[in-house]
Amino acid sequence: MVQAYVFIQAAMGKPSAVAEALRRLPEVKSAVVVTGPYDVIALIEAPDLQALGRVITERIQTIEGVERTLTSLVTGI
């Protein structure tokens, strides 16, 4: 299993809707609205890096209101 944090910049007025849409995806373990340069931070999990990439490009980046993402892989606890 591979985990990553996805930092999301959302369109004006869309952070809550983006976080709600993310929480409906089975790969998303948590999604919260935050302050700072990013609007939403999501923790996602996938079986491998290839699947993780697909989740980001095909499912997260296509959510209405998502403008930009930055992904950081979890390397340890």
PLM regions: where:
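A compositional/biophysical signature of low hydrophobicity enriched in polar/charged and small residues
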Residues: 1-77
